[in-house]
Regions:
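Conserved nucleotide-binding/hydrolysis micro-motifs of P-loop NTPases
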Residues: 4-9, 29-32, 45-48, 60-63, ...
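Substrate-engagement module of ASCE P-loop NTPases
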Residues: 1-5, 210-237
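Glycine-rich phosphate-binding loops of nucleotide-dependent enzymes
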Residues: 113, 135, 192, 196, ...
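Flexible loop/N-cap segments at domain edges
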Residues: 84, 89-117, 161, 166-168, ...
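Conserved inter-motif catalytic segment of the P-loop NTP-binding fold
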Residues: 129-213
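Conserved P-loop NTPase
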Residues: 29-83, 87, 180, 187-189, ...
């Protein structure tokens, strides 16, 4: 039996709740001009059902319900370290990034977050691994073109299928639909590594809470599959360290690298520091670096 409720009159057919064995309430709400469908199981006699609200989408394959949270964490143990693609940075990190962990690259515009991520992606592809790159800020063609300046050639990697770049406008759909596409792509591509550029754009999916839930679910999916997950965040405040993630997920990230820019003597200098890297003996110093036509070079102290 289906019943249409009237807004502001939830008790219009209240007597049906007592008659039915199972009651499911579905609705559609609009937050920040982004529509989201959600359902909640109000009652289900004789069943230990989930009591939270769950987002769902209606697609060509019918209804897809995407639980945001899970009662049990089933993350795989971190694997061996893999190179960042930059030998000097590997030394700063204590040997590189650990496979299957989460990495946050945070910094102001122009600091080199995308460049650093693409250096890693290229190195991984050349090792024969697959990388999924989700971009919320520029098209695949634009990314490939812009990376030519620091000498990072991505086009051949895309042709071989080792690098898969997908671009979406955050506000084009709700967080649940973005999540559905991300999880589907993970199952289709089977990457060893994933990059999300940038998480600061995810707020445009409807709300900060929706962005947080999306990023948490993607992170959990990656850790369950043993996929290294890179999050890039654009810090817009004057204190980059204070705005590491902007969405409140930095505490669950395994490795945090902060990139900053300083104006010294009339010129702009860039520096990075590894704020934390679980399970590794990383450097605790600031390291100056330059973006050249050969990628990223760390300046010797």
């Amino acid at each position: 039996m289906t019943v249409k409720t009237v807004q502001d009159s939830p008790a219009q057919y209240a007597f049906l709740d007592f008659m039915a064995d199972c009651v499911i309430h579905v609705d559609q709400r609009v937050t920040g001009q982004v529509a989201t469908r959600r359902l909640i199981v109000v009652k289900y006699r004789g069943s230990g059902y989930g009591r939270n609200e769950y987002p769902f989408i209606i697609g060509e394959n019918g209804i897809n319900v995407i639980p945001i949270t899970s009662n049990v964490l089933q993350h795989r143990s971190p694997g061996p370290q893999v190179s960042s693609g930059q030998p000097q940075l590997d030394g700063v990190l204590g040997g590189g990034y650990k496979r299957g962990t989460s990495v946050l690259l945070a910094g102001s515009p122009g600091a080199g977050k995308t460049t650093l991520a693409c250096v890693f992606a290229k190195a991984a592809c050349l090792r024969g691994e697959r990388v999924l790159y989700l971009n919320f800020e520029e098209s695949p063609e634009s990314l490939v073109s812009n990376m030519l300046s620091p000498g990072i050639v991505l086009a051949p990697l895309i042709k071989t299928g080792r690098l898969v770049i997908q671009s979406y406008l955050p506000e084009a759909m709700g967080a649940e639909e973005h999540l559905f596409h991300a999880l589907n792509t993970l199952d289709e591509v089977h990457p060893q590594h994933m990059v999300v550029d940038a998480i600061s754009a995810c707020n445009r999916m409807g709300s900060e809470q929706a962005a947080f839930e999306y990023l948490m679910r993607v992170l959990n999916a990656c850790k369950e599959r043993g996929i290294t997950c890179f999050y890039l965040n654009q810090a817009i405040g004057p204190d980059v360290v204070a705005e590491i993630s902007g969405i409140g997920i930095s505490s669950i990230i395994d490795t945090v690298v902060v990139l900053s820019q300083l104006s010294i003597g009339g010129s702009m200098k860039r520096q990075l520091i590894v704020m934390k890297s679980r399970g590794s003996k990383h450097s605790d110093r600031f390291h100056e670096y330059r973006i050249t036509d050969r990628g990223i070079d760390l300046v010797k102290a």
